[in-house]
Swiss-Prot record:
Binding residue positions for carbamoyl phosphate: 87-90, 138, 165, 168, 313-314, 340
Record-given protein name: Ornithine carbamoyltransferase, mitochondrial
List of residues binding L-ornithine: 205, 271, 275-276
Keyword annotations from UniProtKB, A to Z: Amino-acid biosynthesis, Arginine biosynthesis, Mitochondrion, Transferase, Transit peptide
Pathway participation: Amino-acid biosynthesis; L-arginine biosynthesis; L-arginine from L-ornithine and carbamoyl phosphate: step 1/3
GO cellular component, one term: mitochondrial matrix
Taxonomic source organism: Emericella nidulans (strain FGSC A4 / ATCC 38163 / CBS 112.46 / NRRL 194 / M139)
A biological process from GO: arginine biosynthetic process via ornithine
Length: 359
């Protein structure tokens, strides 16, 4: 089975940061807490548990009953939020989750801290982790969050990097779990087997973790991108490896024709065509993604299921999806956004409160 570390390392996703005074790389933290960098880090049962817990906590808290195991569970604990990229939903959901659990969120934006610029990632990780109970990092390169985790003495949770977005995947599958009646299932499943997701747009970090999760949960996913924007080979390897040990893993289809992806789909999904850092490519991308807008007409032409739903992690731009779909009763966009809060609570519970024991 290809590990997350081996797949990423083999594809040269590492990057250069400020050099160390010694030629020898400092050792990993001897305390070895468990980190959450991608859905690939989880077993199928652990992922399903995070999703179920998020949904359960949502029902309880919204009914006015804070689960006993969450009451004051982060009391006296500080969660450092290292955000080198701007954020709306991730920041609000993370800060809200920490506060609801009784902890203190400490926001460190790009004007407060620049990873690997004035201080090595090793020094930053060792120092900050000695003062807090968890690091939630929203960064550029995956290597940045991976290096933070390698040398941290506390759990590191990836709040987005260029390769993965695990908290979004938990929220997305919570949304699907709540919108579709689950079948009878074991603890390693969500009972969503047989569903099909159609992703139409850019193959990006949100898709990668969604596809890994879909494979683990027995949910098929069809991805339609323009030529040249397909899932890269190393990610295909990682997605495929996610199905090892799963009795009926979800199947992945890649195509350059949106209608092919949409056929028999239960959920249509898209995301921004121009991610942060790709602004100079905007004009070219808009030209090449022409024809990939999700519309009711596309769903009809492609033969989506009669009761199909729509999802988008936001922020949304009109070229990606029509207003008719985005604001329709098919849209799960706003419950999906709210579920970022419950996903954050579930992740903090699993990796900080329960020290990586997810049950």
């Amino acid at each position: 089975m290809a590990s997350l570390r081996s797949v990423l390392k083999s594809q040269s996703l590492r990057h250069t940061v400020r050099s160390y005074s010694s030629q020898t790389m400092p050792p990993a933290s001897p305390f070895a807490p468990r980190h959450f960098l991608s859905i690939a880090d989880l077993s199928p049962s652990e992922f399903a548990t995070l999703v179920r817990n998020a949904s359960s906590h949502k029902r309880a808290i919204k009914s006015g009953s804070m689960p006993q195991n969450l009451q004051g569970s982060l009391l006296g604990k500080t969660v450092a939020m290292i955000f080198s990229k701007r954020s709306t939903r991730t920041r609000v959901s993370t800060e809200g989750a920490v506060v609801q659990m009784g902890g203190h969120p400490m926001f460190l934006g790009k004007d407060d801290i620049q990873l690997g610029v004035n201080e090595s990632l090793y020094d930053t990780s060792v120092v900050i982790s000695s003062m807090v109970s968890c690091i939630v990092a929203r960064v550029g390169k995956h290597a940045e969050v991976a290096d933070l985790a390698k040398h941290s003495s506390v759990p590191v949770i990836n709040a987005l990097c260029d390769s993965f977005h695990p908290l979004q995947a938990v929220a997305d599958f919570q949304t699907i779990y709540e919108a579709f009646t689950p079948k009878a299932h074991h603890l390693s499943s969500l009972g969503l087997e047989g569903l099909k997701i159609a992703w139409v747009g850019d193959a990006n970090n949100v898709l990668f973790d969604m596809a890994i999760a879909a494979t683990k949960m027995g949910v098929d996913i069809a991805v339609a991108t323009p030529k040249g924007y397909e899932i890269p080979p190393h990610m295909l390897e990682l997605i495929k490896s996610a199905g090892e040990g799963v009795s009926k893993p979800g199947k992945l289809l890649q195509t350059n024709i949106p209608e092919e992806a949409v056929k028999d789909a239960d959920i249509l999904v898209t995301d921004t065509w121009v991610s942060m850092g790709q602004e100079e490519e905007k004009a070219q991308r808009l030209k090449e993604f022409d024809g990939f807008q999700i519309t009711a007409e596309l769903a009809k032409r492609g033969g989506a299921k009669e009761g199909w739903k729509f999802m988008h992690c936001l922020p949304r731009h009109p070229e990606e999806v029509s207003d008719e779909v985005f604001y329709s009763n098919r849209s799960l966009v706003f419950p999906e956004a709210e579920n970022r809060l419950w996903a954050a609570i579930s992740a903090l519970e699993g990796f900080v409160v329960n020290k990586g024991k997810i049950e």
